[in-house]
Amino acid sequence: MQRPSGSREVRKAVSAVSASKKEQATRVKKHVVRRQKGTMAAAPKSHVHVKKLTVEEGVRTGKNSVHQLQAQVDTATQQESSQGPVLLSQLPETTSVPYTPETMGQQLTVSLSGEPYGPSAMPSMCPSLILQPCATTDPMLLQPQGSSASNQASVSATLEWQEMLEAAEALLALKNSSQTRHQPCGMPGTAGERGLQLPNPSMPPRPASSGSLPSGHLDCMSLLT
Protein backbone atom coordinates (compact mmCIF):
# COMPACT_ATOMS: atom_id res chain seq x y z
CA MET A 1 0.00 0.00 0.00
CA GLN A 2 2.96 2.30 0.42
CA ARG A 3 4.09 2.03 -3.21
CA PRO A 4 1.12 3.84 -4.83
CA SER A 5 1.30 6.61 -2.22
CA GLY A 6 5.05 7.00 -2.85
CA SER A 7 4.53 7.14 -6.62
CA ARG A 8 1.85 9.79 -6.18
CA GLU A 9 4.19 11.89 -4.09
CA VAL A 10 6.90 11.55 -6.73
CA ARG A 11 4.46 12.57 -9.45
CA LYS A 12 3.38 15.58 -7.44
CA ALA A 13 7.01 16.58 -6.96
CA VAL A 14 7.70 16.16 -10.67
CA SER A 15 4.66 18.27 -11.57
CA ALA A 16 5.77 20.96 -9.12
CA VAL A 17 9.26 20.97 -10.62
CA SER A 18 7.89 21.22 -14.16
CA ALA A 19 5.59 24.08 -13.14
CA SER A 20 8.51 25.95 -11.56
CA LYS A 21 10.54 25.37 -14.72
CA LYS A 22 7.78 26.81 -16.87
CA GLU A 23 7.47 29.85 -14.63
CA GLN A 24 11.21 30.45 -14.74
CA ALA A 25 11.26 30.09 -18.53
CA THR A 26 8.43 32.60 -18.92
CA ARG A 27 10.21 35.02 -16.59
CA VAL A 28 13.39 34.72 -18.59
CA LYS A 29 11.55 35.31 -21.85
CA LYS A 30 9.72 38.35 -20.44
CA HIS A 31 12.96 39.80 -19.14
CA VAL A 32 14.67 39.29 -22.50
CA VAL A 33 11.74 40.87 -24.37
CA ARG A 34 11.79 43.90 -22.07
CA ARG A 35 15.53 44.26 -22.59
CA GLN A 36 15.05 44.05 -26.33
CA LYS A 37 12.41 46.77 -26.34
CA GLY A 38 14.60 49.07 -24.23
CA THR A 39 17.73 48.65 -26.36
CA MET A 40 16.04 48.74 -29.78
CA ALA A 41 15.51 52.51 -29.52
CA ALA A 42 19.17 53.28 -28.71
CA ALA A 43 21.06 50.61 -30.66
CA PRO A 44 21.37 50.81 -34.49
CA LYS A 45 19.75 48.34 -36.86
CA SER A 46 23.02 46.50 -37.43
CA HIS A 47 22.90 45.02 -33.90
CA VAL A 48 19.56 43.22 -34.36
CA HIS A 49 21.35 40.00 -35.30
CA VAL A 50 23.46 40.25 -32.15
CA LYS A 51 20.39 40.54 -29.93
CA LYS A 52 18.75 37.55 -31.59
CA LEU A 53 21.82 35.47 -30.86
CA THR A 54 21.77 36.49 -27.18
CA VAL A 55 18.07 35.53 -26.91
CA GLU A 56 18.77 32.14 -28.47
CA GLU A 57 21.60 31.57 -26.00
CA GLY A 58 19.36 32.33 -23.04
CA VAL A 59 16.72 29.90 -24.31
CA ARG A 60 19.33 27.19 -24.90
CA THR A 61 20.75 27.54 -21.40
CA GLY A 62 17.23 27.31 -19.98
CA LYS A 63 16.56 24.16 -22.00
CA ASN A 64 19.81 22.58 -20.83
CA SER A 65 18.93 23.18 -17.17
CA VAL A 66 15.44 21.74 -17.73
CA HIS A 67 16.96 18.61 -19.27
CA GLN A 68 19.30 18.24 -16.29
CA LEU A 69 16.42 18.49 -13.81
CA GLN A 70 14.41 15.96 -15.80
CA ALA A 71 17.36 13.54 -15.71
CA GLN A 72 17.62 13.93 -11.92
CA VAL A 73 13.90 13.21 -11.50
CA ASP A 74 14.18 10.14 -13.72
CA THR A 75 17.05 8.78 -11.62
CA ALA A 76 15.02 9.41 -8.45
CA THR A 77 12.03 7.48 -9.83
CA GLN A 78 14.29 4.57 -10.80
CA GLN A 79 15.74 4.44 -7.29
CA GLU A 80 12.23 4.57 -5.80
CA SER A 81 11.05 1.67 -7.94
CA SER A 82 14.07 -0.43 -6.91
CA GLN A 83 14.32 0.52 -3.20
CA GLY A 84 10.79 1.46 -2.18
CA PRO A 85 8.97 4.73 -1.42
CA VAL A 86 11.02 7.91 -1.32
CA LEU A 87 10.30 10.73 1.14
CA LEU A 88 9.78 14.27 -0.05
CA SER A 89 12.74 15.48 1.98
CA GLN A 90 15.07 13.25 -0.09
CA LEU A 91 13.94 14.60 -3.46
CA PRO A 92 16.55 16.47 -5.50
CA GLU A 93 16.54 20.16 -4.83
CA THR A 94 15.10 22.40 -7.51
CA THR A 95 17.74 24.53 -9.08
CA SER A 96 16.98 27.90 -10.54
CA VAL A 97 17.63 28.57 -14.21
CA PRO A 98 21.00 30.33 -14.51
CA TYR A 99 20.59 33.64 -16.24
CA THR A 100 23.54 35.94 -16.75
CA PRO A 101 22.60 39.26 -18.39
CA GLU A 102 25.15 40.30 -20.97
CA THR A 103 26.43 43.83 -21.28
CA MET A 104 26.48 45.88 -24.45
CA GLY A 105 30.25 45.40 -24.79
CA GLN A 106 29.86 41.60 -24.84
CA GLN A 107 27.13 41.84 -27.46
CA LEU A 108 29.33 43.89 -29.75
CA THR A 109 31.90 41.07 -29.90
CA VAL A 110 29.47 38.96 -31.96
CA SER A 111 30.32 39.13 -35.65
CA LEU A 112 27.50 40.57 -37.78
CA SER A 113 28.33 38.37 -40.77
CA GLY A 114 27.15 35.18 -39.05
CA GLU A 115 30.61 33.89 -38.06
CA PRO A 116 31.15 32.30 -34.61
CA TYR A 117 31.48 35.12 -32.11
CA GLY A 118 34.23 35.44 -29.55
CA PRO A 119 37.01 37.75 -28.39
CA SER A 120 39.61 36.08 -30.61
CA ALA A 121 38.87 38.28 -33.65
CA MET A 122 40.00 41.61 -32.22
CA PRO A 123 43.36 40.55 -30.66
CA SER A 124 44.43 39.05 -33.98
CA MET A 125 44.02 42.47 -35.63
CA CYS A 126 45.52 44.69 -32.90
CA PRO A 127 49.10 43.32 -32.84
CA SER A 128 49.51 43.87 -36.58
CA LEU A 129 48.57 47.53 -36.11
CA ILE A 130 50.71 48.07 -33.02
CA LEU A 131 53.87 46.33 -34.20
CA GLN A 132 54.19 48.13 -37.53
CA PRO A 133 57.51 50.10 -37.69
CA CYS A 134 57.29 53.86 -38.26
CA ALA A 135 58.79 54.93 -41.60
CA THR A 136 61.12 57.95 -41.49
CA THR A 137 60.93 60.28 -44.49
CA ASP A 138 63.75 62.61 -43.43
CA PRO A 139 66.53 62.36 -46.06
CA MET A 140 69.16 63.56 -43.58
CA LEU A 141 68.54 60.55 -41.33
CA LEU A 142 68.72 58.11 -44.24
CA GLN A 143 72.14 59.30 -45.52
CA PRO A 144 75.12 56.99 -44.85
CA GLN A 145 77.59 58.16 -42.24
CA GLY A 146 80.70 56.91 -44.06
CA SER A 147 81.32 60.28 -45.77
CA SER A 148 81.48 62.17 -42.45
CA ALA A 149 83.99 59.67 -41.04
CA SER A 150 86.21 59.96 -44.13
CA ASN A 151 86.07 63.77 -43.96
CA GLN A 152 87.11 63.75 -40.32
CA ALA A 153 90.01 61.40 -41.07
CA SER A 154 91.28 63.62 -43.92
CA VAL A 155 91.03 66.77 -41.77
CA SER A 156 92.96 65.16 -38.93
CA ALA A 157 95.65 63.95 -41.39
CA THR A 158 96.13 67.45 -42.86
CA LEU A 159 96.37 68.97 -39.38
CA GLU A 160 99.06 66.49 -38.38
CA TRP A 161 100.97 67.18 -41.61
CA GLN A 162 100.91 70.93 -40.99
CA GLU A 163 102.12 70.49 -37.41
CA MET A 164 105.02 68.34 -38.62
CA LEU A 165 106.01 70.93 -41.23
CA GLU A 166 105.90 73.76 -38.70
CA ALA A 167 108.08 71.81 -36.28
CA ALA A 168 110.58 71.01 -39.05
CA GLU A 169 110.73 74.66 -40.14
CA ALA A 170 111.37 75.72 -36.56
CA LEU A 171 114.25 73.25 -36.32
CA LEU A 172 115.70 74.52 -39.61
CA ALA A 173 115.48 78.11 -38.43
CA LEU A 174 117.37 77.26 -35.27
CA LYS A 175 120.02 75.40 -37.24
CA ASN A 176 120.48 78.21 -39.77
CA SER A 177 120.70 80.82 -37.02
CA SER A 178 123.47 78.85 -35.32
CA GLN A 179 125.34 78.50 -38.61
CA THR A 180 125.11 82.20 -39.52
CA ARG A 181 126.83 83.13 -36.29
CA HIS A 182 129.99 81.26 -37.35
CA GLN A 183 129.95 82.32 -41.06
CA PRO A 184 130.12 85.82 -42.64
CA CYS A 185 127.01 87.18 -44.28
CA GLY A 186 128.43 87.42 -47.83
CA MET A 187 130.11 84.01 -47.91
CA PRO A 188 128.02 81.35 -49.57
CA GLY A 189 127.87 78.04 -47.85
CA THR A 190 129.00 74.73 -49.16
CA ALA A 191 126.95 72.59 -51.47
CA GLY A 192 125.50 70.66 -48.56
CA GLU A 193 124.63 73.83 -46.65
CA ARG A 194 122.91 75.45 -49.61
CA GLY A 195 120.17 72.89 -49.32
CA LEU A 196 119.37 74.07 -45.79
CA GLN A 197 117.66 77.26 -46.87
CA LEU A 198 114.58 78.60 -45.20
CA PRO A 199 111.40 78.48 -47.27
CA ASN A 200 109.57 81.65 -48.23
CA PRO A 201 107.56 82.76 -45.16
CA SER A 202 104.83 84.23 -47.38
CA MET A 203 103.94 80.81 -48.79
CA PRO A 204 101.76 78.69 -46.48
CA PRO A 205 102.73 75.06 -45.91
CA ARG A 206 100.83 72.58 -48.03
CA PRO A 207 100.84 68.79 -48.13
CA ALA A 208 102.35 67.35 -51.30
CA SER A 209 104.18 64.32 -52.56
CA SER A 210 107.89 63.78 -51.98
CA GLY A 211 108.65 64.44 -55.66
CA SER A 212 107.04 67.92 -55.71
CA LEU A 213 108.36 69.12 -52.29
CA PRO A 214 111.17 71.73 -52.30
CA SER A 215 114.56 71.00 -50.85
CA GLY A 216 113.78 72.78 -47.58
CA HIS A 217 110.78 70.57 -46.90
CA LEU A 218 112.81 67.47 -47.74
CA ASP A 219 115.42 68.51 -45.20
CA CYS A 220 112.65 69.06 -42.65
CA MET A 221 111.39 65.55 -43.22
CA SER A 222 114.92 64.13 -42.90
CA LEU A 223 115.39 65.96 -39.60
CA LEU A 224 112.12 64.63 -38.23
CA THR A 225 113.00 61.07 -39.16
UniProtKB/Swiss-Prot annotation:
Keywords: Transcription, Transcription regulation. The keyword Lipid biosynthesis does not apply. GO terms for cellular component: nucleus. It holds the Pfam family DMRT-like. Residues 1-12 have a biased composition (Basic and acidic residues). Residues 1-49, 179-216 are annotated as: Disordered. Residues 27-37 have a biased composition (Basic residues). It comes from the Eukaryota. The keyword Transcription regulation applies. InterPro entries: DMRT-C1/C2_C. Belongs to the DMRT family. This is Doublesex- and mab-3-related transcription factor C1. The gene is Dmrtc1.
